[in-house]
Amino acid sequence: MFDLRTAARDVGFFYLSGHGITQPEIDAVMGAARGFFALPEADKLAIEMVKSPQFRGYTRAGGELTRGRADWREQLDIGVERATIAQGPGVPAWTRLQGPNQWPAALPDLKPALLGWQAKATDVAIRLLKAFALSLDQPEDAFDAIYRSEPNHRMKIVRYPGRDTTGDDQGVGAHKDGGFLTLLLQDENKGLQVEYDGSWVDVDPIPQTLVVNIGELLELASNGYLRATVHRVVTPPAGIERISVPFFFSARLDATVPLLDLPEELAAEARGPASDPDNPLFRNVGTNVLKSRLRSHPDVARRHYADLLEKASAAS
């Protein structure tokens, strides 16, 4: 437990082996991802994210923003399959995030492949979260109440196309992840980098491992004892593509992130969550998630959340 806590606090990233997911299962989800990206563009655009108020679906390269700059990657976002929530006066805007995924008609095997991976990754993440609770001298079930009944998991399949040096190598810009934990499956091509002691450190792929990093919810819950680490992805050179499958384990949208009562020796090292004036953190999970989605996908925001944009503009 000490090693887990130290890795999470000092770096915020670590490799996980012995996770229980088999190599054939890894190969299957990677094959499904490659199969999707090989589809004709028209098939992918038929499920473009802009059609989904839940921010689910396909985004072409350059279609997502990180800190206002375009990310050079194409991707498919999916979440937990649930019915939409009826809207009306007094219903929080973040309830619009709940709903169905979009799936390509041309690739019917993709849905069971990705939902199956989501289930496997969820099992791993829950075991890890319980271990983190114990490492912080908390009950094993310390977080159960805020994710148990309707967790808000999200995952992507991502392709980073190679390109010639242009002066902009942003595959995805520097950022922190917003959930509890991220479990990343990556192919053999490097590109992920973690900010550590003011420098960017490569997170090279290691076969049969997942890369785990701390999200902002754990940073909030531990009052900053555990840190969500800034990371980015650098675009591969021309002629090379990089495939990854990130899974974001989070809480119920209606949950409020608790502040853990840490033991004295840990509390003394908890300096509060890192503050970014351009990206404030909220303890209400739904508010946090919606804020992040609106910033990253302005086209979806304009189509499905124009009322919120108008209110924000009027208040500014």
In which residue ranges do the predicted regions lie?
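C-terminal flanking tails of non-heme Fe-dependent oxygenases
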Residues: 1-67, 72, 120-316
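Non-heme Fe(II)/2-oxoglutarate
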Residues: 7-10, 18-22, 72-129, 135
